[in-house]
Regions:
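Hydrophobic helix-and-loop "lid/oligomerization" segment in the mid-to-C-terminal part
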Residues: 2-34, 42-71, 87-90, 172-337
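Short glycine/serine/threonine-rich phosphate/pyrophosphate-binding segments
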Residues: 38-44, 101-105
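Glycine-rich, phosphate-binding/catalytic loops in enzymes
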Residues: 46-48, 110-113, 136, 188
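Short alpha-helices
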Residues: 122-189
């Protein structure tokens, strides 16, 4: 199989459009959503490798920072956490894995009207976020997967740092190739990356063996606190600001916890509610099968995918808990569960 044949037919037009568009940009800020996960960091790194191969000036913008457990990924250039003291004034923005401007963070969202922008994402919505072009593919498992297809459409080999970046995105957004989005296309791409030297086992090892003691203590406390609702079909856990302070853990240490709740026997949907600040709570939802947590999140001005979604509730914890669980209950009722 020729590398270009790895691009599925339904993705070919978008990959070719974005590859052509990237040849016409310069002085680019590459950004994704705030508090980036593995797919966001992997997609940004992949974009940086592509832009470097195309001899374009760029820098990565990450807010508030690259999470500690993802810091093993070599980045193509410096990751800036602010738009002050930049190496150049950007003219373009490449927006990745981010369905709406507010999820870029206030600093970049405020600057966005001044820039030409391209948007590549696999979340529903955000189709018009890029002023100069959009490629939104909800059928893709990860935005890093789309960046791999852009690279192939541009005639670039998937090797070295580019391959590792794509591998990170695939591994994290497919749950280590366990989720329902692990399609034949994903497995073909992953196999090609391994053939080209990507250390898939090494990426998994770094992701799975990078816990701090504070994270272990936090998870232990939350495991004791987690509750089952609706006859055991819903798992729920609240996280208060004091929990992070007491254990010395960071917000990023919660990454993956809601997936653990979803693995409880009989659970069809899991909800994690985190107090982010007084009067402001973040929620993460996970589900299996036909349970559409994206619909529950959308009812609360959030978003995501059918089996993984989230959002923000600007209210205190007691009200947020009731609001979130009621929205989830309505979705489960519609499924007859």
């Amino acid at each position: 199989m020729q590398p270009s044949e790895l691009i599925p037919e339904r993705f070919r037009d978008g990959a070719q459009r974005m590859a052509a568009a990237l040849r016409g940009v310069d002085r680019v800020v590459v950004a994704a959503h705030v508090n980036p996960d593995g797919d966001a960091v992997g997609a940004m790194a992949a974009a940086g490798h592509i832009l470097r191969a195309l001899d374009r000036e760029f820098f990565l913008y990450v807010t508030p920072r690259v999470p500690q457990d993802l810091s093993f990924l070599p980045l193509p250039g410096t990751a800036h956490t602010t738009l002050e003291r930049l190496p150049f004034t950007p003219r373009w923005a490449l927006l990745l894995d981010c369905g709406e401007p507010r999820r870029l963070g206030q600093e970049l969202a405020d600057r966005l009207p001044e820039l030409e922008s391209l948007n590549i994402d696999h979340h529903l919505g955000g189709d018009g976020m890029g002023s100069a072009g959009n490629w939104v593919e909800p059928q893709a498992a990860a935005t890093a997967q789309l960046m791999a297809y852009v690279a192939l459409a541009a005639g670039l080999p998937l090797e070295g740092g580019l391959a590792t970046a794509v591998t990170l995105g695939l591994v994290t957004d497919t749950g280590g190739f366990r989720h329902g989005n692990t399609s034949a296309d994903v497995l073909r791409l992953a196999a090609h990356l391994v053939e080209k030297g990507s250390d898939l086992a090494g990426v998994r090892e770094k992701l799975d063996s990078n816990w701090s003691q504070a994270r272990m203590h936090l998870w232990g406390e939350l495991m004791r606190r987690a509750e089952l609702r609706r006859g055991g079909t819903v798992a729920f856990c609240p996280v208060r600001l004091d929990d992070l302070r007491a254990t010395g853990a960071l917000k990023e240490d919660l990454e993956g916890f809601v997936e653990q709740l979803r693995q409880l026997r009989g659970v069809r949907a899991a909800a994690l509610l985190r107090e982010d600040a007084p009067g402001c709570c973040k929620f993460s939802l996970r589900s299996c099968g036909t349970v559409d947590v994206r619909a529950a999140a959308a009812a609360l001005d959030g978003g995501g995918h059918r089996n993984a979604a989230g959002g923000t509730l600007r209210m205190g914890m007691p009200e947020a808990e009731e609001t979130l669980l009621n929205a989830l209950a309505r979705e489960l009722d519609s499924e007859g569960l």
